[in-house]
Amino acid sequence: MKSLFLSLAAMAMFVAAPVLAQEQAIGEKAPMITAPLMGIDGKANTLLDLKGDNGLLVIFSCNTCPFVVGNAHKTEGWEGRYNGLAELAESLNIGMVLVNSNEAKREGDDSLPAMKSHAMEAGYTMPYVVDEGSKLANACGARTTPHVYLYNSNLELAYRGAIDDNVNRAEEVKERYLDMAMRRLAEGKKIKTTETKAVGCSIKRVR
């Protein structure tokens, strides 16, 4: 009886698990490029709308994860580097968008009003949109906040992973993976490091 219960429990967990694709491979086209994504400004845009001449930077993010917003004296988080990335992206004619896929927290910390409030407090200078049902995250295979997806002018994946190698302090960063990838992408050069491990909180999907 015990083994039967465990088997049924395991089956239930399997059935309840969200549909999550493998992480996109380098060179693959961005998914859902014409799907409307509601922003904190009340306007819906698509990835195609947000793309710049040289590509599009998509960062899956949220309002509460310590890897994003920091945690007292332990880590400053990556959020403080978002606006600098936005400035760089604009100078390189690369579009940028933050995507909130935390559907399981949509009635609380990651609601649209909470996103708007957080963006104002943090001083975001880039679009911040809702990924309803975590559909875009599922299609990309995004797993964490933050999780970076950089696409070229044809919306083909050029870099995927982390922003850099130090979430704790920006001044201690040794490898600026995303910065370098964006610059080389805009210059038409081959990106040396196309994949790194994304480190962060799990995206809160509905189960």
Per-range role (PLM):
Residues L20-L48, G77:
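N-terminal "domain-start" segment that seeds a small globular fold
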Residues S7-A16:
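Bacterial N-terminal signal peptides
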Residues M115-N152, A158:
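Short, internal strand/loop/helix patches
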Residues M1-F5:
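Positively charged n-region of N-terminal signal peptides that target proteins for export
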